[in-house]
Amino acid sequence: MTLKQRYQQAGKEASWALSLSILYVIGWCLCAYLPKETQGPIGFPLWFELSCIYLPILFIVIGHWIIKIIFQDISLEINDQGNQK
């Protein structure tokens, strides 16, 4: 992988990480402030269950799959073939 390809991959990974972070904050705000004051299935207020239990679990799963699909192992060695330019 050339140095240019490494930078492109790093930029792609950073974009995904930033997008997921922004999406998480938006999801947390929606889950915390939109539900009515009702009790959730496990006994906590619904807003708490959605924003502090279910949403983090969902994003852990999403993050795991993004790491498996999008992210790549990149060698940190500069002496790789094609990096001399």
Curated annotation (Swiss-Prot):
It comes from the Bacteria. It is a multi-pass membrane protein. It comes from Haemophilus influenzae (strain ATCC 51907 / DSM 11121 / KW20 / Rd). To E.coli YhdT. InterPro entries: DUF997. Keywords: Cell membrane, Membrane, Transmembrane, Transmembrane helix. It holds the Pfam family DUF997. This is Uncharacterized protein HI_0974.1. It is found in: Cell membrane. The chain crosses the membrane at residues 16-34, 50-71. One of its GO terms (cellular component) is plasma membrane.
